[in-house]
Amino acid sequence: MTNYLRLTPIFLVFILSSCSSIYIPSVPNTPMLTTQGEIAAGAHISLKGNFNFNSAYAVSNHFAVLANGAFLQNEKDKKDIKHKMIEIGGGYFKTFGPENNRILEIYAGLGSGKSDRLFRELDANKNILSIDHQKANYDKKFIQVNYSSKKVDNLKLFGVNFGLNYGTALRMSFINTNNFYINNVLQPNEDNIFLEPVFYTRMILSDEVQLQYTSGSNFGLKSRKFLNAGNSVFSVGAVVNLGRKPKK
């Protein structure tokens, strides 16, 4: 019985730590670019406090470059999580459909991230029974397809009409850990492939500024202990588009 009680905190910490993932997906960059010289920038935050920054620049009428970043620092009694990531990429965009109000974007890129997670098992008096400290770096490659429509639907809110745009993105992320430590002991690295479908809605405040709500899922194609699909995408933010040519 005594041995069982000693093992219980360790077992509970393992269960707790396996419920979340080293990898926290960022908000996909969905700039909805239309013309050369256009700049898009967005800032988003999730309920867990994951802050994301996305930017894009249309180098030509069909080619764009991207830069993204994410940062999270969440501290609680039983769990502290620190996570940061940067990405760069580029790709193709094209407008089509009635009045060219539909946009297809195909991007690819690479990035890197750092994860620092501390799990604590506490007793009824909040005394620490055990600690599990996990640190890892990881490399990321991704390919992403965005489809969006600039056809405007209307939402009446507080007596004011706001236009709405909709879009979806499907991202495939290839993640590999390196320098993965648990309690200062080097661990075998893990890899996984994540499918990340995302849907977003934009509320138009002006020609340049929109509010964006994003929701999506995260599916891991491989079974892994620590690099799993333990996090989804749910955020609100704002997007700015500058340099867009006016409609003729």
Residue spans of the language-model regions?
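Bacterial signal peptide processing site
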Residues: 20-23
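Outer-membrane beta-barrel transmembrane domain signature
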Residues: 115-248
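Short boundary motifs at domain starts and secondary-structure transition points
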Residues: 29-34, 156-158
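Transmembrane beta-strand segments that form the barrel wall of outer-membrane beta-barrel proteins
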Residues: 31-48, 53, 60-77, 102-108, ...
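C-terminal motif of bacterial Sec signal peptides marking the signal peptidase cleavage site
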Residues: 15-18
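Bacterial N-terminal signal peptides that target proteins for export
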Residues: 1-8
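Ligand-binding grooves and catalytic loops that recognize ribose/phosphate and carbohydrate rings
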Residues: 72-115
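Feature captures outer-membrane beta-barrel proteins of Gram-negative bacteria and organelles
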Residues: 30-32, 51-69, 83-97, 141-151, ...
